[in-house]
Amino acid sequence: MNKPLLSELIIDIGNTSIAFALFKDNQVNLFIKMKTNLMLRYDEVYSFFEENFDFNVNKVFISSVVPILNETFKNVIFSFFKIKPLFIGFDLNYDLTFNPYKSDKFLLGSDVFANLVAAIENYSFENVLVVDLGTACTIFAVSRQDGILGGIINSGPLINFNSLLDNAYLIKKFPISTPNNLLERTTSGSVNSGLFYQYKYLIEGVYRDIKQMYKKKFNLIITGGNADLILSLIEIEFIFNIHLTVEGVRILGNSIDFKFVN
């Protein structure tokens, strides 16, 4: 029996997890993850592909913030699909509907870059604040008219939680969850409250400040593997899109100017 055709495989290699998205008819048909391991071997990745990807693809686009794994994935993909994957980056040339850089290009993680591109290309917004809550918490602003405005990078909730456990002798590990109240009466409840309300106030504070700074309306888009823990706390209208990064990687891969690719 022939394998079903899914034309594009998008891979987002992050610090905590590696996301795989298969696109069919411009929709995410399959979305799965594996844990990031800096020691991942060729045979481990190949076995993962055998178990999960009984599909044909004709394009593979990758965003990676863990370059030590790039060669392994490149080799596995070529062996498995007979395709050379394209690694997207902020410093390549793309044919987009807007110019991300109105001045000199500056160093930007490929995942952040993909988020910002998707926020403009996939939505009819003029100005967007994009929050990605994963290993790190990134909050970046982008404008259709002025390009990427900049942003802030903070540690994500799990890093903050583990740092507290490592440095506070009397606080023992417990499951983290969205707090019921701002002010809690137990240690675990208070830690949960502090852990997640800080992101609520960070996101809402940055959102209000940039609106005042630029005197413009900004739409808010939230993504990231840990975002679900804070969504119920946010009191500003927002869009949640768990696929924002892979959508951006796909847009970039399909709009690249191959004259500038080695």
Swiss-Prot record:
Gene3D superfamilies: 3.30.420.40
Location (main, coarse): cytoplasm
InterPro entries xrefs: ATPase_NBD (IPR043129), Type_III_PanK (IPR004619)
Binding, ATP: D12, I13, G14, N15, T16, S17, I18, A19, T135
Compartment(s) of residence: Cytoplasm
Record's keyword terms, sorted: ATP-binding, Coenzyme A biosynthesis, Cytoplasm, Kinase, Metal-binding, Nucleotide-binding, Potassium, Transferase
Active site: D111
Domain of life: Bacteria
Binding site for K(+): D132
Pathway: Cofactor biosynthesis; coenzyme A biosynthesis; CoA from (R)-pantothenate: step 1/5
GO MF annotation terms: ATP binding; metal ion binding; pantothenate kinase activity
EC number in record: 2.7.1.33
SUPFAM superfamilies tied to this protein: Actin-like ATPase domain
EC top class, as a word: transferase
GO biological process per UniProt: coenzyme A biosynthetic process
Cofactor note: A monovalent cation. Ammonium or potassium.
Any Gene Ontology CC annotation: cytoplasm
Residues annotated for substrate binding in this entry: Y94, G109, S110, D111, V112, T187
Required cofactor(s): NH4(+); K(+)
Reactions performed catalytically: (R)-pantothenate + ATP = (R)-4'-phosphopantothenate + ADP + H(+)
Role of this protein: Catalyzes the phosphorylation of pantothenate (Pan), the first step in CoA biosynthesis.
Quaternary assembly: Homodimer.
Cited PANTHER family: TYPE III PANTOTHENATE KINASE
Family to which the UniProt record says this protein belongs: Belongs to the type III pantothenate kinase family.
UniProt name for this protein: Type III pantothenate kinase
Organism: Borreliella burgdorferi (strain ATCC 35210 / DSM 4680 / CIP 102532 / B31)
